């Protein structure tokens, strides 16, 4: 089929070619340098660096966070048989705090908290433009009709999603913002920021890549190019997560410090805006 707009007629013949399904591969423990924020008999909390895939998948059969977890920890929850210990995920380019369950009881306990929206999460991001001081985005999210690898806001279908935001500081041409997702949809924060005209910096999949710089005065060109080199990924960091501990039933808050690329970018922006 040469064009997606081509309409089929009766008796048309279609030849389909499918790639063979990958052979199920055992997940091999690998010695990775994990930044372990907290650990006890029930759970572990990791500060995931940007660029690290959470679990093996198509094209990523090794060097993932899960490979490192299997090496470092004697026990992990069974969870999904292919993702032991993994309670929730972060995108490859997103840095920050991620929870790991060390037994099935803890996994179930944490899963229920996510399902019941008890988990409190805070992200920090750099977004394009001057975002209003605070607000919320409430849009349903679904697969993009033309590009199935990304998501988009939709009407009358999709999955409901809600994000609160608060601008911390405007450092032209970007805003430093805190994001508080109340639902946990895939790419939620990235989709929501794009939907209100302030995509996350260097998020090319959602309109925030280098091309977005054309929206700004030429006086910002040199600064933007410098920032793109400083943060060669989506400028999004999972800074805090607050949960009921599955053993003690006490609230606990875990925080991942800002990574060097974001610290450096903020220093550059503050210097240029002083």
Q: At which residue positions do the language-model features occur?
A:
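RNA pseudouridine synthases
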Residues: 1-274
């Amino acid at each position: 089929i040469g064009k997606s707009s081509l309409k089929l007629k009766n008796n048309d013949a279609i030849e389909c070619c499918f790639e063979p399904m990958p052979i199920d591969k055992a997940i091999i423990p690998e010695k990775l340098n994990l930044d372990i924020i907290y650990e006890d008999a029930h759970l572990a909390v990791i500060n995931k660096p940007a660029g690290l895939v959470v679990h093996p998948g198509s094209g990523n059969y090794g060097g993932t966070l899960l490979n490192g977890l299997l090496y470092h920890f004697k026990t992990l929850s069974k969870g999904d048989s292919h993702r032991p210990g993994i309670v929730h995920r972060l995108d490859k380019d997103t840095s920050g705090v991620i929870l790991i369950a060390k037994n099935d009881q803890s996994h179930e306990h944490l899963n229920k908290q996510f399902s019941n929206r008890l988990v409190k999460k805070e992200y920090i991001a750099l977004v394009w433009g001057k975002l209003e001081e605070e607000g919320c985005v409430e849009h349903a999210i679904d697969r993009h009709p033309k590009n199935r690898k990304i998501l988009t806001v939709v009407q009358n279908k999709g999955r409901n999603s809600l994000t609160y935001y608060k601008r911390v500081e405007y450092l032209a041409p970007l805003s430093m913002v805190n994001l508080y997702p109340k639902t946990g949809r895939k790419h939620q924060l990235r989709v929501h920021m794009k939907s209100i005209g302030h995509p996350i910096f260097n998020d090319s999949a959602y309109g925030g890549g280098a091309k977005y710089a054309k929206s700004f005065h030429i006086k910002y060109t040199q600064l933007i190019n410098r920032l793109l080199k400083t943060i060669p990924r989506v400028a999004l960091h999972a800074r805090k997560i607050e949960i009921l501990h599955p053993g003690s039933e006490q609230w606990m808050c875990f925080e991942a410090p800002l990574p060097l690329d974001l610290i450096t970018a903020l220093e550059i922006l503050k210097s240029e805006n002083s």
